[in-house]
Amino acid sequence: MARVAVVVKVYPDDVSIDPKTLAERIKSKLPSGYEVLAEGEEPIAFGLKALKLVIAMNEDTEGGTEEVEQLLKNIEGVQEVEVENVSRMQ
């Protein structure tokens, strides 16, 4: 089964939320079939940092990235999720 790498930008709901803590919370909440391959931070404004993640998932997931977006949005501390890129993994 083919897998895709989804690059997402996760915006925390408060400047006091540590991106590393948020990344660990996300990793612990993702169900099987999803895997965080890479993580980083991107400064936004006024001390707010977005969390950038590369998440591997099955290519044939019904609804495409909608499921992972909803999973992330339902995690405590997440305000918004933006999919930046989706590419097939080899």
Swiss-Prot record:
Superkingdom classification of source: Archaea
Pfam families linked to this entry: EF1_GNE
Keyword Protein biosynthesis: yes
Keyword Protein biosynthesis: yes
GO molecular function, one term: translation elongation factor activity
Keywords from the UniProt entry: Elongation factor, Protein biosynthesis
Family stated for the protein in its record: Belongs to the EF-1-beta/EF-1-delta family.
Role played: Promotes the exchange of GDP for GTP in EF-1-alpha/GDP, thus allowing the regeneration of EF-1-alpha/GTP that could then be used to form the ternary complex EF-1-alpha/GTP/AAtRNA.
Name of the protein in question: Elongation factor 1-beta
Organism in which the protein naturally occurs: Aeropyrum pernix (strain ATCC 700893 / DSM 11879 / JCM 9820 / NBRC 100138 / K1)
